[in-house]
Amino acid sequence: MDQEAVGNVVLLALVTLISVVQNAFFAHKVEHESKAHNGRSFQRTGTLAFERVYTANQNCVDAYPTFLVVLWTAGLLCSQVPAAFAGLMYLFVRQKYFVGYLGERTQSTPGYIFGKRIILFLFLMSFAGILNHYLIFFFGSDFENYIRTVSTTISPLLLIP
């Protein structure tokens, strides 16, 4: 594979692999909690602790395809570095949500709201990349450098709670 092509996606691939490890960690927590209270077999029902772990994992799994689509679309069509940064922030927030959900449910709310903001940022990056493609196609105007500058400048603002 061409090194330039790999360089264009390596950060996105790294964030994706980290997210896979995180998913495996969440699944391990569900399995561990199930076996701790149900013996050797896996049950979908059980104690309150198991219900919380299972629900937190399921909520994270439900949002995972959306995250991957906007991460890769934003990275490929707009700019890889801000998309990868936002992806790492999303994984951090998802971890915070998961751990918060295991305690009081109100502890998971900041992670949930922060995660929605990051998904929105990635969606807007994706939309800007698609819009730029059609502006080039129909009008010959390329705003790629401007879009990259704006997305790179705005991405650190994701750190503000």
From Swiss-Prot:
Q: Which domain of life is it from?
A: Eukaryota
Q: What is its main location?
A: nucleus
Protein known as = Arachidonate 5-lipoxygenase-activating protein
SS bond list: none
Domain description: The C-terminal part after residue 140 is mostly disordered.
Pfam assignment, any one: MAPEG
Q: How does it assemble?
A: Homotrimer. Interacts with LTC4S and ALOX5.
The segments annotated as topological domain Lumenal are 1-8, 78-80, 129-161
Which family is this protein grouped under? Belongs to the MAPEG family.
Q: Where in the cell is it found?
A: Nucleus membrane; Endoplasmic reticulum membrane
Please indicate the ranges of residues that lie on the Cytoplasmic side: 31-52, 103-107
Show intramembrane residue spans: 108-115
Q: One GO BP annotation here?
A: leukotriene production involved in inflammatory response
Its topology with respect to the membrane? Answer: Multi-pass membrane protein
What is this protein for, i.e. what is its function? Required for leukotriene biosynthesis by ALOX5 (5-lipoxygenase). Anchors ALOX5 to the membrane. Binds arachidonic acid, and could play an essential role in the transfer of arachidonic acid to ALOX5. Binds to MK-886, a compound that blocks the biosynthesis of leukotrienes.
A GO term, aspect molecular function: enzyme activator activity
Q: Does the keyword Membrane apply?
A: yes
Q: Name one GO cellular component term.
A: nuclear membrane
PROSITE patterns according to UniProt: FLAP_GST2_LTC4S
Q: Which residues cross the membrane?
A: 9-30, 53-77, 81-102, 116-128
